[in-house]
Amino acid sequence: GTGKPLREFLFVDDLAYAIKFIVENNIESDLINVGSNEEVSILELAKEIKSVVGFEGELIFDSTKPDGNPRKLLDSTLLNSKGWNAKTNLSDGLEITYSWFKENI
């Protein structure tokens, strides 16, 4: 693809805190989206990963391949209106995850 599609990523600890928040606050709904409200392009994600891991090579995208859905972003309005928001941005989440992998894998 081109790297242009927009996506949303959520750090796993933020998901765990969201579940705890939902249970402790007795939030009831048929559907509760848990999102970061931070959308980034696949290109931005690749650049961020490249920076975190110290990769010095070139990022190559193949525009002959499909991009898929141009935008995937959750509507987290319900949970945000109750006072919960993700605390870990993408950059910090990648740093934490990469550090964990280096120490444990």
Where are these regions (language model features)?
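C-terminal substrate-binding subdomain of Rossmann-fold SDR/epimerase-dehydratase oxidoreductases
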Residues: 1-105
